[in-house]
Amino acid sequence: VVGSWNFKFAYYVIGFLIFVGAILGRLVCGFLCPFGLIQDLLNKIPFPKKIRTFKGDKLLRKLKYVIFLVFVILLPLFLTDIMGQGAPYFCKLICPAGTLEGGLPLVLLNKAMRGAIGWLYIWKNTILIVTIVLSIIIYRPFCRYICPLGAFYSVFNKVSIYRYRVDMEKCVHCGKCAKACQMVVNPVENSNSPECIRCGRCKQACPVH
């Protein structure tokens, strides 16, 4: 769609994403994303030491914005085919969700395609395996560091119709909400952080909610 200087801009696609973002923000990530659910289930697998955060975590979270800019916007605009169309480079080169939900089933169910497996398929499956392993240790690594759609929706978190509000008159500053947040957000300090996926764990943990 955005891969040609002569394209007819798909206003309906961008308009729909903006519409959803303006209403829900990253609630989409918390409740509507199937790969988010898969990561949630993987994170429930017991592991000796789960990693909540680490040095460089905040900086690494900026990566999803870089991925959005480079692989969703710039590469499709500047790397085009003879027809002037750009490929969906994020889906083609990175997306582990597409590999798990589309690529793997397609190859497993279609014998004719197995002979066409090349370096790109191996590369994407490597990314998928790394993401799966990290999901057991770290809560939602794909959502935190990679997902360009999460980066897009995060822009709307502070202005979306559905957003969180902390009643400071009732708040007892116990810190339970911050401890409950697996995305490592402190709702008292930033109730509508771009990293908040609206999972509601902070509300469940709040003693005065």
Give the predicted meaning of each segment.
Residues 189:
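Donor-sugar nucleotide-binding helix/loop cap in glycosyltransferases
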Residues 1-184, 194-209:
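Non-ligating segments of multi-cofactor redox enzymes
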